Every structure is written in C-alpha cells, then in structure tokens.
A protein has these predicted regions:
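Membrane-active amphipathic alpha-helices enriched in small hydrophobic residues
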Residues: 146-164, 168-180
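Extracytoplasmic and endomembrane cell-envelope/extracellular-matrix remodeling and assembly machinery
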Residues: 24-31, 42, 54, 62, ...
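Hydrophobic or amphipathic, alpha-helical segments that drive membrane association/targeting
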Residues: 4-5, 9, 13-95, 177, ...
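Acidic/histidine metal-binding catalytic segments
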Residues: 60, 80, 138-147, 164-169, ...
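Catalytic Zn2+-binding segment of zinc metalloproteases
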Residues: 116, 126-143, 161
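Short pre-active-site segment immediately N-terminal to the catalytic Zn-binding motif
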Residues: 106-120
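Active-site His/Glu-centered metal-binding helix of metallohydrolases
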Residues: 44, 122-134, 195
C-alpha cells in the first residue's frame, strides 16, 4: 500500500490555496505529449493492478467507468481515453494520474451521500487530467525529474500530518526549481474546482453536491482532531475554496437529482466487502428493520450477497424473492439472480436459458458474462462459450479474467 500511496501522491497536487486563476497557457504539452502521459499512466497502472489493495471487481469498475464516462463526454476532451478504478481502502481519497487514469477509494464512495457527490469528485479529478496538471508541474524541467517527484512524494507521505515538515523535506530533496512547482500547484485545485463544476452541470448532476461534500469533509476533519481524511491532505480544502465553489453554484439554476439505483447497489456491495458476512447480515438486517436510512432495495441486495457468502442459501433465496419483484430490470440484480442459481439457492433446470436472456438484456455487464461463460463450460457447450468470450474480449480487451476464461475454453477444445 505504501508504494500505491507514493504513486498517488506523485500525480496529485501537493498544496492548494484559493487564489486567482491566471492563464497558465498550454506549455504543458511542450514538455510531455499526450502519448507520453498515457505511457506514464499505463506504467503506473501496471504496479497498481498488482497491488493487493486494487479492487478487482467488474461490477464496481463498470459502474465507475459508466459514471465517469458520462462526465468525460461533457469535458473539454470527450474523445480522450479514461479508466476509472477502485482501491479497497477505507481512507477517503481519490486521485488522478496522467493519461486519464483515475482511482477512487472505497471509503470515498461509501462516504458520498449521493451520486452527485461522487460525480463531483470524479469531475474534479477529470479536470486535473484534461488540464494536464502533472505536465504543468514539471514544465521546463527534464523528463527524468519524475524520479525526484517520487522522492518528494515520499517526503510528503512521511510528514503528511505536518505540512511544515513536509515542506522542509521537499526543499531538502530538490531545492532548485521546486518552489516554482509549488506555485503552480497552488492554482490547480481551484482550476479543477471551476472546470469540474462545469462538467458536473453539463452532465445533469446536482451542482450543490460539490461544496456540500467538501464542507462535510472539512467539518469531519475538525472533529477528528488531526486525523484528517486523506482526501483533504492530497486536495486541501480551505474556507476560501468552499466559498468560491458555493458562490459559483448559487449562480446556477437549482437542479435536484436522485441517485441511481446502481449507485445504491454499489455502496451496498462495498459494505459487504468491508465486513465479514455475519457482520454484513447484522448490518443489513438492522437497516431494513429501522427503515429510516438508505435504499431498502439496496439494503436487501446487500443482505442477499452476505447470506450467499455465508452459504445460508435458503434464506438468501427467500430474501431475494421480494427484491426481484421490486426491480424488474437491473444488471446487478440479474447477476445476483444468476449467482443464486449457480449456488443452488434457486433451483432452475433451465439455468442456461436464464443466462441467455440476461446476457441479451445486459450484453456489456462483465460479471454476468463471467458467470454465463462458466455455465456454458459446465454444460460442455464449448462452441457457444468461445463465441461469447471472443465477443467479450473484443469489447473489453483489457480484462485479464476474460482471457483466462477464453484460454480455459480453448484448452478443452485442444
């Protein structure tokens, strides 16, 4: 995890103050081309995917990329390739890397009280990428200065609770030229706020969510007495920044937006990952019993996942029945229905027909396709499995699990 934090800090602003925004120009691409930025990001992602904290969950990744993709389409660079991914870490943080790679901690997703709040953070990170902030930070320096940036990140990590100590460590690492970097990065956060807010509005989300989320984090940091959320250490939020965002929001038309069901389901699924199955069962039973907070559909969804994990199959099927009646068409719930069938919680002699119909309804839902492929392999329908997996690999060329399933299928065929 230490290595992962170093990578994150290398590509996020170090300090921030609410200042005016001079025209920084487009000097960044004179130093690092978009192709080089992508290469740097790819190399970093290679290390991140190998880290145990990388959350390899297709449903959560697909949700983040669907949400992030809708935001990118309303950015200044809608054609740029982006990849959004989750880090299994309770710390409230998100970070952008060059080339369009954006990581979000599970703690931040669970802390977001609405989809608009999560979208506001993603919009902010998208702005860091589209504005080429990393390239601006090292403009005028040699390309190999990235090595010293890693040392700077290490200094910040070791003194993250003491900004003054961090500044002293940074200057000790690279006295010449670092002050100019800091002067530029002081502007990046406010620029990302302004541009991110525009992305949020164009994408149809509640713009009030941005100042609301930042203000809540700031208040929580005061209550924690020094145990500042990680997001505030890598993206310092000042009263001036919050006031500036709030002032901009007040000039925009009010547009309340309900959170999607998928947002609620993802949060429920993350709760099951943060707890033991028994703890999750107690948690969701309590939530459903009080019926005061959260989405009851999502709470029941989380309960069924926990029951399935604990092999309480009969009760899992019992709890799933009303869920299926409440929601007629949803990829995540259809995937859970398939998992209950595969586990034997729901007896279905026509299980392949169920998966065929579900796959037709949700052809891009990778988790569903994983299970459908397994069913086809179990039924020795190898040609059907090959056809399905070849199409999925074409649609998702960076998914190693699909390649694994494809290789298993070809191995059986000889």
């Amino acid at each position: 995890m230490r290595k992962l934090l170093l990578i994150a800090l290398c590509f996020t602003p170090l300090f921030s103050h609410a200042e005016g925004l001079p025209d920084l120009g487009d000097i960044s691409q004179e130093v690092i081309s978009p192709q080089q930025e992508r290469q740097i990001g790819e190399q970093s992602m290679y290390q991140i995917r190998a880290d145990k904290s990388y959350l390899d969950d297709a449903e959560i990744a697909d949700y983040l990329n669907l949400l992030g993709g809708s935001l990118v389409s309303n950015s200044s660079e809608p054609g740029q390739a982006f990849e959004f991914f989750a880090i299994n870490d309770n710390a409230i943080n998100a970070f952008a890397m060059p080339g369009g790679f954006i990581g979000v901690n599970t703690g931040l997703i669970l802390t977001s009280q609405s989809e608009s709040e999560l979208a506001s953070v993603l919009s902010h990170e998208i702005a860091h990428v589209t504005q080429h902030h990393l390239a601006r930070m090292i403009s005028g320096q040699k390309f190999d200065s990235l090595a010293s940036m890693a040392l700077i990140a290490a200094a910040i990590l070791s003194a993250r609770s003491n900004p003054d100590a961090a500044m002293a460590a940074i200057v000790g690492v690279q006295a010449g030229g670092i002050q100019r970097q800091i002067n530029f990065t002081r502007l990046h956060e406010q620029e990302a706020d302004r541009i991110g807010l525009g992305i949020l509005q164009k994408s149809g989300f509640d713009t009030r969510a941005m100042p609301t989320f930042f203000e809540r984090l700031q208040k929580s940091s005061r209550l924690l007495e020094g145990n500042t959320p990680t997001y505030l250490r890598t993206h310092p939020v000042t009263n001036e920044r919050i006031a500036d965002i709030a002032n901009r929001v007040q000039q925009l038309p009010y547009h309340p937006v309900a959170s999607s069901l998928d947002f609620q389901l993802v949060r429920a699924k993350l709760q099951t990952l943060q707890k033991t199955p028994q703890e999750a069962i107690v948690y969701f039973n309590g939530a459903l019993g009080t019926q005061k907070f959260g989405n009851p559909v999502a709470q029941r969804y989380g309960l069924v996942i926990a029951l399935l994990q604990s092999r309480q199959l009969a009760r899992a099927a019992q709890e799933f029945a009303p869920l299926r009646k409440q929601v007629q068409s949803n990829a995540m719930i259809a995937t859970l229905a398939g998992q209950l069938r595969r586990a034997g919680a729901i007896s279905d002699p026509n299980i392949s027909d169920f998966f065929q119909t579900a796959a037709q309804n949700f052809p891009q839902h990778r988790a569903l396709m994983y299970d459908y492929s397994e069913v086809l392999l179990q039924q020795k329908r190898y040609s059907d499995a090959v056809a399905l997996l070849n199409q999925q690999v074409a649609d998702h060329p960076n998914d190693p699990h699909l390649y694994e399933l494809q290789a298993r299928t070809y191995a059986v065929l000889g």
